[in-house]
Amino acid sequence: DATAETNIIQDPEAADRVFHSGADVPMVGLDVTHQCLLGSDATAQWRQQAAPTGVRTFLADIADFSIAANLHADARLFSAGMPLHDPLAAAVALDPSLVECFDLPMKVETETGDFHGTRGRTIGDPAGLIDPSAPRVHVALTVDHDRFITDFTWRIAQLAGD
């Protein structure tokens, strides 16, 4: 679905409950994760540092396959590499300073049609906008791309060892 994020569409009702729970919840949407692309330059570095049959070579092969698949799916959107959706979300959970956020009441569409949007789409909650006590979600607006990519590629290289 073009309007629902993969992790949300798997269980929109659960995601909506999390958004309304009052928990300290960051949301890193596609508009932000698409700012953090892993390109073939990074995988080339992994290959240079790897033993010919090492873990880094294996990880570079997997990443290059994903980069190629994304490029095949949409050459314009993925010309610079593949988005690191889940790695960025995990990194933000560990280090919220990677992103700048705006606190907003959010909801997840759980139905489609009849004045509903598309199931799984995340939107600002109009009811929460008029209720100052409504739970807020930390919606990421920007990311420190350079810091994240540098840290991510370094950590992968360190974990790979070889």
Question: Where is each model-derived feature located?
Answer:
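Conformational coupling and interaction surfaces
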Residues: 9, 25-162
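Active-site glycine-rich loop that binds ribose-phosphate moieties when present
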Residues: 1-20
